[in-house]
């Protein structure tokens, strides 16, 4: 009898451990990768095999570094200098080519914003001068879109380009004194694809992410609950206060943002499939101000963006400090205090007080 009970117990433990092992939505961390992040004029890189952080200073001679991305297996840097935009190859230690990009200046003159997106095999410039958006491919082919739908109305706008060169815009018009009557218009390549209401403007974290052929509008509703939409129906998820980013891994939708706790501190949170993960303890950045004495500080965090590589998810988590908190236009003021990168749910790179402009994941053989 004791032997039978022992065997049943052992079998149940094996089944439990197998179920737990296969329950995660991502692949096991078996492959070494190099994480390369751009912050200011410095490149930070780390190989997960040894965990050693390496820094490479580019200096200011190339202007403001705007973006870091992979193109045909090579790292590329995009910058804005006094003489125009530059596209540069970067081998991990040095800039190996430095070509001025005249296309953007030819179209816009002194544009206020420009960036690059890549599918890995081709890339697209997206830029604006607050009158129009211009999308160019690497061969100089161009498309133009209006910056606003209707300049006679106050509005707030978002824009993004995916790796296939599709351009997405989202506008919310402030129609009346009743915010809940406001609605978003979402366009793809200049054509309206849906309208959606119930998502308010949260200037820091309201966002759009293009994933495949879908575009997700992300943010918070008027009851301070996380919300996302990929069509005219907004989906509320009260495990979040704000949803700020999305991706798909192994066919499952992944959402990131934060949940405000009882101390009014925002906790970095992500959802994969039907599971939720609080990354705050692993991040090691949490503190709340004592409500009675005022002692201490509010240290918050938020999942800001995702990258997917080899069925693993890489998460950029931002640390925030609440500095002289006040309410301006209905929003708390928080100061960005630094970024960290998680591999699935574990922190692998922490840049202290440095903010990551862009980041790439490079598998190592």
Question: Where are each of the predicted segments found?
Answer:
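Bacterial Sec-dependent N-terminal signal peptides
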Residues: 2-33, 40
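Residue-level hotspots at or immediately adjacent to binding/recognition sites across diverse folds
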Residues: 24-365
């Amino acid at each position: 009898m004791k032997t039978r009970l022992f065997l049943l117990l052992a079998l149940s433990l094996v089944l439990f451990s197998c179920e737990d092992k296969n329950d995660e939505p991502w692949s096991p961390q078996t492959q070494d990768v190099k994480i390369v992040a751009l912050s200011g004029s410095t490149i930070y890189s780390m190989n997960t095999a040894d965990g050693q952080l390496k820094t490479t200073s580019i200096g200011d001679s190339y202007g403001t570094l705007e973006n870091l991305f992979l193109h045909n297996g090579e790292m590329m840097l995009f910058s804005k200098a006094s003489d125009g935009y530059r596209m540069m190859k970067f081998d991990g230690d040095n800039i190996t080519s430095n070509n001025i990009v005249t296309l953007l200046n030819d179209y816009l003159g002194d544009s206020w914003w420009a960036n690059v997106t890549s599918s890995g095999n081709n890339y697209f410039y997206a830029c604006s001068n607050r009158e129009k958006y211009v999308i160019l491919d690497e061969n100089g082919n161009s498309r133009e879109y209006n910056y606003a739908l209707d300049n006679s109305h106050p509005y707030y706008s978002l824009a993004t380009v995916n790796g296939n060169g599709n351009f997405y815009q989202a506008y919310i018009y402030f129609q009346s004194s009743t915010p809940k009557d406001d609605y978003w218009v979402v366009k793809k390549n200049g054509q309206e694809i849906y309208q959606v209401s119930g998502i308010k403007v949260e200037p820091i974290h309201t966002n759009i992410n293009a994933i495949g052929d879908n575009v997700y509008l992300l943010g918070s509703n008027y009851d301070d609950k996380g919300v996302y939409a990929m069509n005219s129906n907004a989906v509320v998820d009260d495990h979040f206060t704000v949803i700020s980013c999305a991706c798909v891994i192994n066919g499952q939708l992944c959402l990131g943002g934060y949940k405000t706790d009882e101390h009014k501190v925002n906790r970095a949170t992500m959802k994969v499939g039907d599971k939720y993960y609080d990354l705050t303890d692993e991040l090691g950045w949490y503190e709340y101000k004592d409500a009675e004495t005022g002692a201490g500080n509010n240290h918050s965090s938020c999942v800001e963006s995702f990258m997917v590589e080899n069925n693993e998810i890489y998460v950029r988590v931002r640390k925030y400090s609440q500095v002289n908190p006040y309410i301006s236009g209905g929003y708390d003021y928080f100061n960005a205090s630094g970024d960290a990168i998680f591999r699935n749910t574990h922190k692998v790179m922490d840049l202290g007080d440095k903010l990551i402009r862009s980041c790439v994941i490079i598998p190592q053989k």
